């Protein structure tokens, strides 16, 4: 980046004008620090954003998948993984301190970071207290998810163990399409009925794909 005028270099620009003044590629370039032969660091940063669908897509990408990208060695992959974990922990802390419906976008962002990059289907639950603050996020089932593979009694058991008052269901679609299926709707109703028996309310069910999250509640499917 030394070939750029001083006031256009990302680091100098950040120090002079603050991080909000930087484009996504410029922020990423600060993490990457160096580019490749024939490809400057800003070009590499933009190529990564284009490939993975922006910053949210990049942060939701599995570390192993990043290993296939030319120019991302172990050190750079470790730094990106650290940023991802910081984002996860920051969102989890926020959800633990405030009711989830005070920050619905934070819930979606958190689920993107947790589930979007999974190469297989994962069913997870956010267990909430009486104030709808996060008690725990748990991945409970993996594989092809349907009423036969997701056991309501196991979800109920965890809710009771955590003394949860409410729950948000979530699962991913590795296909990249976040549209709920009929099987997803049937599973939701089965879990909703099972949890109601122990006075645990299902507040929502999110379907997560890279770059998008669909809410059952917003669709009127709950």
UniProtKB/Swiss-Prot annotation:
GO biological process: proteolysis
Annotated InterPro entries: MPN, RadC_JAB, RuvA_2-like, UPF0758, UPF0758_CS, UPF0758_N
UniProt domain MPN: residue ranges: 100-222
Pfam short name (any one): UPF0758_N
Motif (JAMM motif): 171-184
Residues involved in Zn(2+) binding: 171, 173, 184
The entry's keywords: Hydrolase, Metal-binding, Metalloprotease, Protease, Zinc
GO molecular function: metal ion binding; metallopeptidase activity
Family the UniProt entry places it in: Belongs to the UPF0758 family.
Name of the featured protein: UPF0758 protein Mpe_A2695
Lineage: Bacteria, Pseudomonadati, Pseudomonadota, Betaproteobacteria, Burkholderiales
């Amino acid at each position: 980046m030394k070939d750029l005028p001083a006031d256009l270099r990302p680091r100098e620009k950040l120090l002079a004008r603050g991080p909000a003044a930087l484009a996504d590629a410029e922020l990423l370039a600060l993490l990457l620090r160096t580019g490749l032969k024939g490809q400057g660091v800003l070009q590499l940063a933009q190529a990564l954003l284009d490939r993975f669908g922006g910053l949210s897509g990049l942060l939701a990408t599995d570390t192993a998948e990043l290993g296939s990208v030319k120019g991302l060695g172990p050190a750079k992959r470790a730094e990106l993984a650290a940023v991802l974990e910081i984002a996860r922990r920051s969102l989890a802390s926020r959800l633990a301190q405030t009711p989830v419906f005070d920050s619905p976008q934070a819930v979606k962002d958190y689920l993107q970071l947790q589930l979007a990059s999974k190469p297989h289907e994962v069913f997870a639950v956010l267990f909430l207290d009486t104030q709808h603050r996060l008690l725990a996020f748990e991945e409970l089932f993996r594989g092809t998810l349907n009423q036969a593979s997701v056991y309501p009694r196991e979800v109920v058991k965890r809710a009771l163990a955590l003394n949860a008052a409410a729950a948000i269901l979530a699962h991913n679609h590795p296909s990249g399409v976040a549209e709920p299926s009929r099987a997803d709707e049937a599973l939701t109703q089965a879990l909703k009925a099972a949890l109601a028996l122990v006075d645990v309310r299902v507040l929502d069910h999110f379907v997560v794909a890279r770059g998008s999250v669909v809410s059952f509640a917003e669709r009127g499917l709950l």
